[in-house]
Design a protein with these regions (language model features):
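Helix-coil boundary and N-terminal low-complexity module in membrane systems
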Residues: 1-112, 123-128, 132-221
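Cyclin-like alpha-helical protein-protein interaction core
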Residues: 114-118
Length: 221
């Protein structure tokens, strides 16, 4: 009897691990065109939601990707442009200061801080906006943006944790000395983003439930 229980638990674990890997592979493939990263995140959140409630994860991914493609496409591109430009300014500024500390002045530090604020804001918005678009497709654009910032202000620490986890692979690619990215990258990413999505769902659950009371979710097809 004990052996059967152990075997069942092992098979259950392997099944969940296999599902997580398949979800991640589909997510990574969907991200290849770059502009579809927003829709792919929405699809991954849909897959996680469907899995939690016992439905087909593929159906959830398809629903999230298809139904929120254009909205998350716009949100992702805008956030990526703002955040990417701001991060590049921060990177250039920090490199210049490290090369010559004597150049530090208000004219250098203030733009650096402003760029950092814009970069953080863009990363926060992307991290919260994409799951919000999946959970509440009926929100119009203005309400969507306002609600995104509402979540950020009501749960700042949770949102920062989600941002840190979401952008961690990018940091590894930039500072590849922290990990042999090219050797273990695919194995690392094979389960990473699903874990991030589960964690983000848990951390933002209270905020999402609070918003659900204000904007009841439409039935999914």
């Amino acid at each position: 009897m004990e052996k059967e229980n152990v075997f069942q638990k092992l098979m259950g674990f392997l099944n969940k691990a296999g599902t997580a890997i398949m979800m991640n592979l589909l997510f990574l493939v969907s991200c290849l065109p770059i502009v579809t990263i927003g829709a792919a995140w929405s699809g991954l959140y849909g897959a996680v939601r469907y899995t939690i409630r016992g439905d087909s994860w593929f159906a959830g991914f398809k629903y999230g990707f298809k139904c929120h493609f254009f909205r998350n496409l716009i949100g992702w591109i805008f956030g990526a442009l703002v955040g990417g430009y701001a991060l590049s300014r921060v990177y250039i500024g920090v490199m210049n200061i490290m090369a010559d500390p004597a150049i530090m002045s208000a004219g250098v530090v203030i733009p650096l801080v402003i760029s950092g604020v814009f970069a953080l804001a863009a990363m926060l918005v992307i991290a919260v906006m994409l799951p919000l678009g999946m959970y509440f497709p009926q929100l119009d654009v203005n309400t969507w943006l306002v609600t995104t910032w509402d979540i950020i202000f009501h749960a700042p620490l949770q949102c920062l944790v989600v941002v840190a986890l979401m952008w961690f692979p990018l940091a590894l690619l930039i500072f590849e000395g922290l990990l042999y990215v090219y050797t273990f990258g695919l194995v690392f990413l094979a389960v990473y983003f699903v874990l991030v999505t589960f964690i983000a769902t848990i951390l933002l659950k209270k905020s999402l439930l609070r918003i659900l009371k204000l904007y009841p979710r439409e039935e999914e097809e």
